[in-house]
Amino acid sequence: MDKRLVSVPYMATVDEAVKQMIQNNVWSLVVERKGAPWGVVTERDVLRRCLVKGLPTSKTSVGTIASSPIVTIGSEATIREAMGKMAANEIRRLFVVEKGKMIGRVTQTELFQSTLDVMEALSSLSSTL
């Protein structure tokens, strides 16, 4: 889980959001509206919902291309539950919530790596038996 949660205001421009992504080395931002988490904007949203459509990034509000609501999962969820939720929602990242507060995000890549790590550990264990 990556605990770096970077946010951007709903009315920020796509240009501003992309700068935030680059400066923070993240590819998704939490979009805030009225001071609360409202949605998520990703690099894919920028490409598909803005650039491909020819919308001006300097004038387009990040809120108009963001996905909402934010898809979350509890901090005690299993890898299987997280992967299932991603598949069901056709998304590549989930935001992790604990006691009603967002504490991080997890990506498909991180879940796949965790699965591989577990499989490798099991393989190593079974070969020593």
Q: Model segments located where?
A:
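Tandem CBS (Bateman) regulatory domains
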Residues: 1-4, 42-72, 78-87, 105-129
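The conserved cystathionine-beta-synthase
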Residues: 7-25, 32, 72-90, 97, ...
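Short hydrophobic/aromatic-rich motifs at helix boundaries and adjacent loops
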Residues: 16-20, 33-35, 53-55, 65
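A glycine-centered beta-loop-beta connector
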Residues: 21-24, 29-45, 86, 94-110
